Amino acid sequence: MANKVTGSTDTSGALTTAPSIMKSILVVGTKKENSTTEIKENTIFGITGTADAKAAFGDNAVVEKIVKVFIQNGADYINGMILGSSETAMADALEASMADKSIKVIIPEGNDTKTIAALKDHLALCEKNDMFRYGVIAPTEEASATQTTLIAYGKTVDSDRIFIPSTLPTLNGAVVDPQVAAAGLGALIMTETDDPALPMNGVSMAGYSGLSRTMLETEMKILANNGITPLYLEGTAPTVYRLVTSCVTDESDHKVWQEGTTRFIADYVLETNENMLRANYKRTKNVVRILNAIKGDIKINMEKFEAAEIIENWDEATLTVTKDPQDMYGALVDYEFDVVTPLYTITITQHMKL
């Protein structure tokens, strides 16, 4: 029998991971009395704790509580922005926020119709500029009182990038401000979507001690089918039943973008591929060799996504990289993949131009 045996282990193929994307959460609010720091309006600044929020926003209890909920739910990269006083203050602030591409989630201090309209327009503008962001708007106590009022409220928001929690949480027996409620769901979107395909079902929020009302499962299903993210209690913690976008009025869009995971997956795949191409092809010739290299890099990324179970049914045959007939310096990239939801298998087609 041999008395010496040697060997080695090769782990080069043992791990499959998709690239992570830097992300931060932004709170936008008004400056109150007793602010102790001089920060200009519409300027992004970092927040590391509630003391920073109080110093910047002054006696703005809502913003301070929003930041506290962020921290309690693990959101550790927090930005703030102070609103101006003009009629277009929210729109102006959100436009200025585009200077920081790391911002993924926006929580405004208010939930009025003007704020919602500005947020919807901003999120749509960001998407057109390859910045993929989300917002959370919570209903007033009156709007969240019944299923009927909640569904009606959801129709006034109606966005595949805005989420609406169904019920206002309580803290020590008192119902919290709507946007303090929104902060919990916003923080979960920040911290629980590193794997964009992992459902949010059953994830609890910290920073609260109950819900203002509870619902039957059938009631929660109805809300989820109407653009409202239902919450239930797990012990004393508000917990996500099913994360859905508020996109409801367009039936075809509603079916595609109903599930939050579908929105997250589509954004994640497109953004990761775009970032990779920007990094690898800053200055190249538009020749067949480069087009083939681009195709190979996209193929590797898509295989990683499928191995990580982020996408399904990826078929290399759907991937094309061609010269842009309208632009001698441009290239066109197209591909398809599937996202499987509890109700549908959705085929996503993505297009890029270099």
Where in this protein do the model-derived segments appear?
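Surface-exposed assembly/interface segments
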Residues: 1-354
